[in-house]
């Protein structure tokens, strides 16, 4: 069985997106192995520059997948810009097209919450490109559990409805998304399923029981006001002020340690890097009961660390 898992990143600093990709493969692999069905996973948006077979660990399971070339131009301008790359890597380009033509399923995880226009039209176009390929090659594709919407732009909403309606199976990870789809397409079957990251294996990290351990995820994207840096997501509060207030409150409590736990990590500063903002807060407070968590190398390490908390708060979905 040939399975394309689209909009699924594996080599990415957003540990939540990686958790979705890892968990999706982990669950499907487990089900198909139990039925003795041979299968191959293909990831066109894995994040790896080197195409071909890769392996990733999920607990005691080794998952194999093939990283593909991303062949979908978002616009004519984008196509022209990438034309030289397509010509230079013509064999790879044709090999990727062959995978799409022969695939049994396209399963789309949508990076969790990117099947929407809250991140802008370009992000939606990139996500929706896999829907277009599914329709172009007449493939059975399913929308894996994810957030769907919101959509502010009517033209984007119209495209989204076409894509959802064509899908063989539609799964959401929250009731709000399920109800949203039912309002858009009353006759479309849609299921509400828990987030696939709940199935990701982990090993609970043990902390000193003398303290109450409070985990806090600080979103860099919210800290800076979104990509536009002008309160893109319409928050009703001053987010940095709120974070300082939360930290101050818990540090004033007896026997409480506050752990700053990033969702997005990286070695360089950028607008989504939670670790950089957490590091700055850690340096600013210089408090013995404020802990900066490790820079997690994979989502399993992050989940294992979070599992050791007594109480947790987070802005990003997978942090919570």
What do the predicted segments below correspond to?
Residues 1-320:
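Active-site anion-handling motifs in enzyme catalytic cores
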């Amino acid at each position: 069985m040939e399975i394309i898992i689209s909009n699924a990143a594996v080599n990415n600093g957003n540990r939540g997106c990686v958790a979705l990709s890892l968990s999706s493969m982990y669950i499907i692999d487990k089900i198909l192995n139990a039925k003795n069905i041979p299968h191959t996973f293909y990831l066109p948006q894995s994040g790896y520059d080197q195409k071909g077979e890769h392996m990733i660990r999920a607990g005691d399971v080794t998952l194999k997948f093939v990283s593909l070339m991303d062949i979908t131009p978002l616009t004519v301008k984008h196509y022209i810009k990438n034309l030289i790359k397509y010509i230079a890597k013509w064999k790879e380009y044709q090999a990727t097209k062959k995978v799409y033509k022969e695939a049994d399923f396209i399963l789309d995880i949508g990076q969790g919450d990117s099947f929407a226009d809250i991140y802008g039209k370009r992000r939606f176009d990139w996500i929706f490109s896999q829907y277009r390929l599914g329709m172009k090659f007449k493939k059975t594709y399913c929308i894996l559990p994810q957030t769907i919407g919101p959509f502010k732009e009517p033209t984007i909403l119209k495209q989204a409805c076409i894509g959802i309606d064509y899908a063989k199976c539609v799964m959401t990870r929250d009731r709000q998304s399920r109800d949203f789809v039912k309002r858009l397409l009353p006759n479309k079957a849609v299921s509400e399923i828990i987030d696939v990251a709940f199935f990701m294996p982990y090993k609970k990290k043990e902390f000193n029981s003398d303290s109450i351990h409070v985990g806090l995820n600080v979103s860099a994207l919210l800290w800076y006001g979104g990509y536009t840096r002008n309160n893109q997501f319409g928050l009703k509060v001053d987010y940095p002020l709120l974070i300082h207030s939360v930290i101050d409150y818990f540090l004033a409590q007896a026997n409480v340690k506050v752990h700053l736990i990033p969702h997005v990590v990286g070695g360089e500063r950028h607008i989504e890097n939670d670790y950089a903002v957490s590091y700055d807060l850690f340096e600013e407070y210089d408090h013995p009961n404020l802990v900066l968590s490790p820079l997690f190398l994979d989502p399993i390490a992050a989940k294992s660390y979070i599992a050791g908390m007594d109480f947790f708060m987070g802005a990003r979905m997978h942090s919570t």
